[in-house]
Swiss-Prot record:
Biased composition range(s): Basic and acidic residues: 18-61, 276-316, 333-349
Record's GO cellular component terms: axoneme
Top-rank taxon, per record: Eukaryota
Descriptive protein name: Dynein axonemal intermediate chain 7 homolog
Region (Disordered): 1-61, 274-362, 410-452
Amino acid sequence: MPPKSPNRSGKSTPTRGRPGEKKDEEKLLQDEEEERLRLEQEEKARQEKEAREKLEQERRAELDTKKDKQVFETNIELGAVKLEVEQVKNDKLAHAEWNRYMKCDGKPDPTSVKEINTFISLSHEKGSPDVNIVLEDAKLILSLISDLNELLEDFTPEEFEQKVDSYRQTILSLQDLLLNRYNEATLKMLKEASYEADSESGNLQKVVDGENETIMLWANLNKNPRFKLFEFENEKISFELPKVLAMADIAVRILRTKFDHYSHQCTTFLPKKKKVKDEEPIPEEPPKPEDAEEVEVKGDEENGEDAKSVVEEGRQSKQSNEPGLVNEGEKEEETKKDENEGEKEDAVKTPDVQIEIEDDEEEILDPDVVDLRQFSPLGGVYHVDLLKTPPQPNIVRGWTLTQIIDKPLSTVKYPSDNPNTGRSSSRVASANPEGRDEGSPSKTPLEQQQPPIGLTFALPSNVMFFEEPQVASWDSSDKHWKTSGITDTNFDEENRKLLFKTQEFGTFCLMQDSHLNMPFQSWELKPKGTNSTVLTITAAIAEVEIEVKDSKCRLNAPAEDPPKELSGLYGKWMAVPKLIAAMRDAGVNVFPAEDSHKFVSIQSKEVDLERVYEQMAILSSTFAFSWSKWNNDAGSKQVIIQIAPCLIKENVPRDAVSDDDWSIFSVSDDMSYKLALSEYDEEFADVVAKGATYHCDLLHAQYERQPLKTATKNCWNNSPKNHKTRTSFSFTRLPHY
């Protein structure tokens, strides 16, 4: 029989596990172990994250508390400075008023409309035309104008809004009075021209020098047909007259003034005020279309009246010799105030967007109009006038016969359709009926008969011109400096002379780009002791060094080849506004205006720089500051500067700060910290330096530096015991100017 099968009985017998099943079990166990480890790691990571978040929250809370404390301390210090500035302003005004009262010299109070009107009236009625007396009166008038300008500069319009228009109108009235006094002196000299005629030429050639002006007068008494050109030798100013004027009863007056009474009348003299858009939603019930049109038209009419009144005030002041212009201006101002108060609600409802659009349209100037935000008039103003010579005294049989003419100084219009040239223009035209010159077919008959006038101005010896100056003439109707009508300009750089031709007589000035020395190449601010520091600026062309001590400052001369044009400024201590004005008048403008970024290519920074400057001023007695090349690589919300400690005493050498002392700091509106960066690195890295911490401002970032805590704290601590070492208010208030 065959053998039985093992499973034939039907009972199951144990079998060995398959290899695949064993692997599955091992994998399952491994997955379970990995899952357990993963959960443990996640739990550990969660706990660590919670711990970090808790620490971060605690750190942030600590930083917030620290920041609040630091901001509070800084605000106290800066607030004290601002209060001191306001007190200084008030004391200055009271001191000036008291000095005027104590002098008792008969000088009128420029802030009193009544006294100014009385002064103007008496000047018209009793003022002597003698040139020496006129020059003395000019000093008084200019001092009154200067006092009013200082008031307008020291105080913002918001501080005495009701007086601004009155002060400006007073300035215009005084300027018109001054020009009228010059005309009276000129007329008197012309009436006596034959007594002072030159023995060789037979013409009047007279120059009168004043403290602020020079009157150059030439009268055509001889009427030499060969006359062509005359030069005032000492002043190096000459004019070339066309032949059509050689036989005329005319005189030429060139009045050169060191002051400029025209530019402030331009619409581009001051920067445009930024209009703040009203974020309030439009009312639910907007005005009807008819009402909206009425409001818009009404606003336009008011704006038109305001603009027209400024021009008309200047015209009326020149046409009338009677006082009272200031009162009329005040009446107009009161009338406008009443109208504005009555329409206040309508004005609020008028959209601000429309006003901004109107401002943008005003900024679009004609090509020949000089933008005073971009260019600056330098060297004063040249008034070149063609005058009519009054009848001269005649001597008959020992008697001197003088024709009495009670008329003001009269000007001769040139070019004119019918010029008074000794022969009628019709005769000249009849010689060439077609009005055509074969040699110059492009010229008109008027240009052939009355060619342009040639003028040569010597550049002022106290003004630096870094490029060829631009000539501009004053347009009295538009109240702008313009370049139209100026031709054939030729600049003699070696002899510092500018030659040009003009079709009309008038008022001229020399212009230069205000931003020639911008942007700066570098700058440094180094202390020389308590309340004393030196600012060195390497500009695009010039290099200047300004020393500041207490509330005064001065321009230091360079060691080698100091410019002769600035010799009158070197070493003279002045108040900050006066030094800024003096340097600008001398052609060295290193003081950016609030809108200079429109004309200079720079990286704009969205940082409150004024607040940074204030803190730098507080620290400037013990810290040196400098520019950093990384400032351009940083973002718009960061300012990168170099700072070095200077625990020095008085009169320390300039090179007391070594390269190793400088550290680089990042400053923003809400944070300041030291960077792990040097000026010699190849790439910019915004990384906090080892051991440094974040601070709310520059002031506290310097306070943490060892071993300077005590010295830095004394720079700005208000404690009386630190009075000798802290920076004074008179020094820290300088940035406010």
